[in-house]
Design a protein with these regions (language model features):
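Envelope-exposed proteins and targeting segments
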Residues: 34-36, 74, 83-85, 123-128, ...
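Sec-dependent signal peptide recognition
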Residues: 2-8
Length: 190
């Protein structure tokens, strides 16, 4: 019985952990039917605030590969040089703190435990994908995903996480039709 209680508590805590949150925003005055090609924007210079563990060529290939797959599936064609759209991405890593308080007094076996407050620190990563009009340099669409991250992921796990984030971001991408101003900012938790 004691082992079953621990397993149930672990499953509850795992289910309450940070999830991948996906958002998008766009300019409804642009008609995506007028665009057929895209290209990558210039590489971002690594600054002191950008963690080189996340800004690297391996993740660059993973993000671009997943975005390429999503955009070509929507009928856009990759074109080196002159194109209708320019795709940029950004990675932001922030330190976060969460405070978890146990309920006031609970019984654990033969012991009565007092309320405890635990402070947990973790890193939160945000992947932002921007799509801009290449002729005006105006932002047309922005999608982003935010989640807790772990620096100790295996390469296979990292690839799966990036693909999942990019796929969920592009689920918010308009389907090549004129968007309506009434829908504006969108959010979905996965």
């Amino acid at each position: 019985m004691h082992k079953l209680t621990i397993v149930v508590l672990l499953l509850i805590c795992w289910g309450c952990g940070p999830q991948l949150q996906v958002y998008s925003d766009y300019d409804p005055s642009y008609d995506l039917k007028n665009y057929t090609t895209f290209n990558w924007g210039p590489k971002i210079n690594i600054e002191a605030g950008n963690n080189p563990l996340y800004y690297n060529e391996l993740n660059d290939k993973r993000i671009k590969g997943a975005a390429l797959q999503q955009l070509t599936a929507r009928g856009y064609r990759f074109e080196e040089g002159s194109s209708d759209l320019v795709v940029h991405y950004h990675i932001i890593i922030d330190d976060q703190t969460i405070i978890v308080t146990d309920p006031p007094g609970y019984e654990y076996g033969p012991y009565w435990l007092r309320m405890q407050t635990n402070i947990r620190q973790y890193q939160e990563g945000t992947l932002i994908i921007d799509i801009m009009d290449s002729h005006t340099n105006n932002l047309i669409w922005r999608g982003w995903a935010t989640s807790a991250i772990d620096m100790h992921y295996s390469p296979d796990h990292t690839e799966v996480l990036i693909k999942k984030a990019v796929d969920k971001i592009f689920k918010k991408f308009p389907k090549g039709v004129k968007t309506s101003a009434s829908t504006g900012f969108n959010q979905a938790a996965y």
